[in-house]
């Protein structure tokens, strides 16, 4: 399982995960990334999202219709910047991940988890077993294809 200590985070990763920051839209690593695999918490290495739930939302950040497990994410009321939103944090490391909105695809439940790339690490499908995430392979529709 991949893990990082807080002192290993770069400036942007620290700003996002520890200071509730937001990275620029359309200028982040995973906003337009659709390779098969999982997205894990940058600090704890806990799996949070899969490419199966990722969709193109044109918001400039990676968007997912649901979390891999409700046990791994925490939703909190966020009243910053004069708005009321729902913040998403990692349960294990208490890192800020992004926000969840009710404007996602209706056919998948209507949610859009808008996640900062700086808060997650992508693990390609073909590396799941090697990196200790083999138990997640059944979450993929086409388990043999990359």
Curated annotation (Swiss-Prot):
InterPro entries: Met_Sox_Rdtase_MsrB, Met_Sox_Rdtase_MsrB_dom, Mss4-like_sf
Class of this enzyme: oxidoreductase
Chain coiled-coil ranges: none
Molecular function via GO: peptide-methionine (R)-S-oxide reductase activity
Transmembrane region(s): none
Record keywords: Oxidoreductase
Domain MsrB, residue spans: 2-125
Location of the active site: 114
Domain of life: Bacteria
Reaction(s) catalysed by this chain's protein: L-methionyl-[protein] + [thioredoxin]-disulfide + H2O = L-methionyl-(R)-S-oxide-[protein] + [thioredoxin]-dithiol
Cellular component aspect of the GO annotation: cytoplasm
Keyword Cytoplasm on entry: no
PROSITE patterns to which the protein is assigned, alphabetical: MSRB
EC number: 1.8.4.12
Annotated GO biological process: protein repair; response to oxidative stress
SUPFAM superfamilies: Mss4-like
PANTHER family xref list: METHIONINE SULFOXIDE REDUCTASE (PTHR10173), PEPTIDE METHIONINE SULFOXIDE REDUCTASE MSRA_MSRB (PTHR10173:SF59)
HAMAP family listed in its UniProt record: MsrB
Family: Belongs to the MsrB Met sulfoxide reductase family.
Protein name: Peptide methionine sulfoxide reductase MsrB
UniProt source species: Staphylococcus carnosus (strain TM300)
Classification lineage: Bacteria, Bacillati, Bacillota, Bacilli, Bacillales
């Amino acid at each position: 399982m991949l893990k990082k200590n807080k002192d290993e985070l770069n400036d942007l990763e620290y700003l996002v995960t520890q200071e509730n920051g937001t990275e620029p839209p359309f200028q982040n690593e995973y906003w337009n990334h659709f390779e098969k695999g999982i997205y894990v918490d940058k600090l704890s290495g806990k799996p949070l999202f899969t490419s199966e739930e990722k969709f193109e939302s044109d918001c400039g950040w990676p968007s997912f219709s649901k979390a891999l497990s409700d046990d791994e994410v925490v939703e909190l009321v966020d009243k910053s910047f004069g708005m009321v939103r729902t913040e998403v944090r990692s349960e294990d490391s208490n890192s800020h991940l992004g926000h969840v909105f009710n404007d996602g695809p209706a056919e998948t439940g209507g949610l859009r988890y808008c996640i900062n790339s700086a808060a997650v690490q992508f693990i390609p499908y073909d590396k799941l077993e090697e990196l200790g995430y083999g138990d997640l392979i059944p979450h993929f529709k086409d388990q043999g294809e990359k």
